[in-house]
Design a protein with these regions (language model features):
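Core alpha/beta nucleotide-donor-binding catalytic domains of modification enzymes
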Residues: 2-138
Length: 138
């Protein structure tokens, strides 16, 4: 984060929403080159839910679109139910949502690394296929 960005953030009114909006505006000005759509990785945990709800506020105020993406790794019997629950939360919040599924056989060892690599590949492939070049993750 640049020194100027840090100083601008300090001048905001201090609320988390205002700070997030300020940060997103600065990121868009500096990096996103006029993009209208952004993706958000949402696992359903507290961090990613907080991020997507804050980004929704920013998107509404700035005329941007956010798309929430959840990866179902299919590693637990309840993983699809968990992803469906996130989909329900996003629907209630008026946020477009897609569930991406890690298909195929899973490795016996190194599962965490393989799952992370599969997650990033799925997210990147979806974004590129849909003309989205920025993804937020918590």
């Amino acid at each position: 984060m640049t020194k100027a960005l840090k100083n601008n953030l300090k001048r905001e009114n201090g609320s988390l929403v205002q700070t997030t909006i300020c940060l997103c505006n600065r990121l868009c000005d500096e990096k996103a080159c006029g993009q209208q759509s952004f993706a958000v990785g949402v696992s359903g945990g507290a961090d990613s839910l907080a991020l997507v709800y804050l980004l929704r506020e920013w998107a509404l105020r700035c005329g941007k679109k956010i798309v929430a993406l959840t990866v179902d790794h299919q590693l637990r019997p309840t993983s699809r139910q968990e992803a469906d629950y996130v989909a329900k939360l996003m629907r209630q919040a008026g946020i477009e949502h897609h569930i991406l599924t890690w298909e195929g056989e899973k490795p016996v060892s190194g599962i965490e690394t393989a799952a992370r690599e599969a997650r990033y590949r799925l997210l990147e492939d979806w974004c590129l296929s849909n003309g989205i070049y920025t993804i937020f993750m918590a």
